[in-house]
Amino acid sequence: MSEKVVATNKKAFHDYAILEKYEAGIVLTGSEVKSLREGACNLKDSFVMIEDGEAWLYNCYIAPYKPAAKFGHDPTRKRKLLLHKKEILKLMGKVKEKGLTIVPLRVYFKNGKAKVEIALAKGKVKYEKREAMKEKDMKREIEKSFKGKIKL
């Protein structure tokens, strides 16, 4: 199984605590697929909403494919996500009752098909973000101090 990651949403890991991850297919036009293969995608401000029993990806920027300018697409249009009905109902229930949100984490190709990894997430408060940054800095310092001392 070959996976080629096109885009990751680093801001989602900073702003949210990730609870559960799901893999979803995505409905795209031909020019969008070609643009994705070039790596022209941005997930920074994107989010997932469930409307009428269907999952939709909003604000995902996929740059227009230059050679197909004649048949171009809207770069930030809403795109349908392909999930099983059980998964959609499960996500819908959790989002309604607990105040959670669904965010896309990365876009990638798996066996030639475009996929989106989405996650059920809970927003972090400012002090939680600071704690996470301090923890990351401490890990980095520890690794740096051990780097020169361990020899095999």
Swiss-Prot record:
Name the domain of life this protein comes from. Answer: Bacteria
Transmembrane domains' residue ranges: none
User: What keywords is this UniProt entry annotated with?
Assistant: Cytoplasm, RNA-binding
Q: Which InterPro entries does the entry mention?
A: SmpB, SsrA-bd_prot, SsrA-bd_prot_CS
Q: Which CDD domains match?
A: SmpB (cd09294)
Q: Where in the cell is it found?
A: Cytoplasm
Tell me the Pfam families matching this sequence: SmpB
Q: Which GO terms describe its cellular component?
A: cytosol
GO MF terms held by the record = RNA binding
Q: Which GO terms describe its biological process?
A: trans-translation
Q: Chief subcellular site?
A: cytoplasm
What does the UniProt function comment say about this protein?
A: Required for rescue of stalled ribosomes mediated by trans-translation. Binds to transfer-messenger RNA (tmRNA), required for stable association of tmRNA with ribosomes. tmRNA and SmpB together mimic tRNA shape, replacing the anticodon stem-loop with SmpB. tmRNA is encoded by the ssrA gene; the 2 termini fold to resemble tRNA(Ala) and it encodes a 'tag peptide', a short internal open reading frame. During trans-translation Ala-aminoacylated tmRNA acts like a tRNA, entering the A-site of stalled ribosomes, displacing the stalled mRNA.
Q: What family does the entry list?
A: Belongs to the SmpB family.
Question: Cross-referenced NCBIfam families, in alphabetical order?
Answer: PRK05422.1, smpB
Q: Which PANTHER family does this UniProt record tie to the protein?
A: SSRA-BINDING PROTEIN, TMRNA-BINDING COMPONENT OF TRANS-TRANSLATION TAGGING COMPLEX
Q: What is this protein called?
A: SsrA-binding protein
Q: Which species expresses this protein natively?
A: Sulfurihydrogenibium sp. (strain YO3AOP1)
Q: Which gene encodes it?
A: smpB
